[in-house]
């Protein structure tokens, strides 16, 4: 251990009276290592450390000096959360597909393991992550603390909301110092009976052994019986494409109205491609441009310059993307349609 200050962030389930602490030094000599707080001193000899007997918390921190042969070498500041669950992500390949890899691009997808532990230390979920990727628009571009999307290998209720789903989001709340806004308004929306409102809860995130802060874990706005209850096109694609979404590559094309769309190559189209589709209006502007652009695997630009992400199905074939981009263009044309006097009519005979 070197340097003046070190911070240890513990989950709510950790026992401060039975903490296992290890101090590593760069010396081969026999050294006496001690922890000293405002209430006492304890030699580190392999026994558990009772933090509460060594120091009182001040401003939420237990401050312990590390003494090496009686000389102060560093200070450890210990903080502990209260009343929220802890979520542990462990990458399958932390060397090449760890957090740095995932944070570098929303196109980078990793796999791993997930452990969710409640405030009392009970495992809520312990299983595989079949997908782990960064998400967000402006927050992804500008914030160091990234948000993520995770996909479990089976449906599970991570936050005791009564709904089991595979796909969840971890919202960083980078632009909200209170970390309350998103949850507060979603809870309000649920109380008002608004449809398609995702359930949320706070968690502490530990990613490959590093504490990343408090996140909001949320159901993803997705197509399912407890979410947006429309025809699930992803299931239709999965039924006719083995390994759907694996090693997917994309290409660009134009629909019959001359608007660009992006699709996934090599897919067999389902027999019925009329829906449902879950769309997202994307307002993020691309570099060196004043115009937004879709930033998912499937997306299109409308005649009015709006950028639309297709959130479900995540990977769309060429015919499906042509269909939904043209359908939306006809909707947009109707919205902006005017008669000879400039009155909006809601009808466009040309489309």
Residue ranges, per PLM feature:
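A conserved hydrophobic secondary-structure block that centers on an alpha-helix together
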Residues: 159-214, 314-350
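Short strand-turn-strand beta-turns centered on an Asx-Gly dipeptide
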Residues: 36, 69, 153, 208-209
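Conserved oxyanion/phosphate-binding beta-strand-loop segments in alpha/beta enzyme cores
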Residues: 110-172, 316-320
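Extracytoplasmic/secretory soluble proteins
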Residues: 77-90, 95-103, 107-110, 127-128, ...
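N-terminal module-boundary/linker segments of secreted carbohydrate-active enzymes
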Residues: 5-8, 52-131
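Gly/Thr-rich phosphate-binding loop signature of adenosyl cofactor/nucleotide-binding cores
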Residues: 218
């Amino acid at each position: 251990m070197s340097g003046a200050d070190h911070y240890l962030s513990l989950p709510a389930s950790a026992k401060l009276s039975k903490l296992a602490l290890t101090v590593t030094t760069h010396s081969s000599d026999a050294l006496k290592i001690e922890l000293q707080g405002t209430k006492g001193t304890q030699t580190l000899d392999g026994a558990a450390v009772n933090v509460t007997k060594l120091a009182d918390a001040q401003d939420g921190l237990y401050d312990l000096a590390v003494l090496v042969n009686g000389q102060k070498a560093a200070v450890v500041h210990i903080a502990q959360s209260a009343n929220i669950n802890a979520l542990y992500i462990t990458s399958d390949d932390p060397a090449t597909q760890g957090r740095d890899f995932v944070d570098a691009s929303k196109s980078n997808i990793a796999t791993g393991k997930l452990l969710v532990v409640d405030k009392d230390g009970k495992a809520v979920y312990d299983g595989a992550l079949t997908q782990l990727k960064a998400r967000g628009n402006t927050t992804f571009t500008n914030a160091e603390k990234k948000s993520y999307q995770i996909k479990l290998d089976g449906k599970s209720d991570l936050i005791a909301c009564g709904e089991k789903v595979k796909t969840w989001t971890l919202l960083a709340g980078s632009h909200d110092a209170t970390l309350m806004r998103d949850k507060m308004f979603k809870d309000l929306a649920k109380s008002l009976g608004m449809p398609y409102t995702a359930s949320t809860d706070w968690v502490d995130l530990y990613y490959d052994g590093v504490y990343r802060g408090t996140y909001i874990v949320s159901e993803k706005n997705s197509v399912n019986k407890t979410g947006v209850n429309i025809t699930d096109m992803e299931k239709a694609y999965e039924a006719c494409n083995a390994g759907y979404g694996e090693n997917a590559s994309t290409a660009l094309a134009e629909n019959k109205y001359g608007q660009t769309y992006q699709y996934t190559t090599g897919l067999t189209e389902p027999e019925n491609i009329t829906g449902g589709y879950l769309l997202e209006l994307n307002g993020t502007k691309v570099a060196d441009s004043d115009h937004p652009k879709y930033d998912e695997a499937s997306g299109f630009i409308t005649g009015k310059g709006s950028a639309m992400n297709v959130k479900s199905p995540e990977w769309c074939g060429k015919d499906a993307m042509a269909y939904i981009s043209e359908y939306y263009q006809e909707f947009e044309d109707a919205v902006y349609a005017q008669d000879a006097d400039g009155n909006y009519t809601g009808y466009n005979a040309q489309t």
